[in-house]
């Protein structure tokens, strides 16, 4: 079960990495810029209703990376109440399977090959995240 609102009441949870109220535009309390895509890998593949921050999509430049994650989510019908199974959770790794169709790795651990079952291929990856989809 996921922590917080998405674990407690996923149908009502709205997830986001940044928005105009977090002060990111004024650089007051921004989400760490080197972790933004890790955040999107999480919210676009997990429970809840994800919101993409306009500035991240149109101004920052990771539009293609975000598009790939949205495509995976759409292709596999991930929704606010998708089934989440935590495969591994450590200080350097969070590995989860969603609806038996998508696997998400967050964290710096690189060697997770023995944890990924056969029949999955990498669909998206970046700084400390990777997403596999069932083929």
Swiss-Prot record:
EC number: 3.2.1.1
Transition state stabilizer, annotated site positions: 21
Key words of the record: Calcium, Carbohydrate metabolism, Germination, Glycosidase, Hydrolase
Enzyme class: hydrolase
Listed cofactors: Ca(2+)
Keyword Iron carried by entry: no
Catalytic reaction list: Endohydrolysis of (1->4)-alpha-D-glucosidic linkages in polysaccharides containing three or more (1->4)-alpha-linked D-glucose units
Cofactor note as given: Binds 3 Ca(2+) ions per subunit.
GO biological process: polysaccharide catabolic process
Keyword Hydrolase: yes
UniProt: substrate binding residues: 1, 7-9, 20, 26, 105, 132
GO molecular function: alpha-amylase activity; calcium ion binding
Miscellaneous remark of the record: There are at least 4 types of alpha-amylase in barley. Type B isozyme mRNA is undetectable in unstimulated cells and increases a hundred-fold after stimulation with gibberellic acid.
Oligomeric form and interacting partners: Monomer.
Family: Belongs to the glycosyl hydrolase 13 family.
Protein name: Alpha-amylase type B isozyme
Organism: Hordeum vulgare
Annotated gene: AMY1.5
């Amino acid at each position: 079960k996921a922590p917080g609102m998405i674990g407690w009441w996923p149908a009502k949870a709205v997830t986001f990495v940044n928005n105009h109220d977090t002060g990111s535009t004024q650089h007051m309390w921004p989400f760490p810029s080197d972790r933004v895509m890790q955040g999107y890998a999480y919210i676009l593949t997990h429970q809840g209703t994800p919101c993409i921050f306009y500035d991240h999509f149109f101004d920052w430049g990771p539009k293609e990376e975000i598009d790939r994650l949205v495509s995976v989510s759409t292709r596999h019908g991930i929704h606010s109440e998708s089934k989440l199974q935590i495969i591994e959770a450590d200080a350097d790794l969070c590995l989860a399977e969603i609806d038996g169709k998508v696997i998400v790795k967050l964290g710096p651990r690189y060697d997770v090959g023995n944890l990924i079952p056969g029949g999955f291929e990498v669909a998206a990856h970046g700084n400390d995240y990777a997403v596999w989809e069932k083929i």
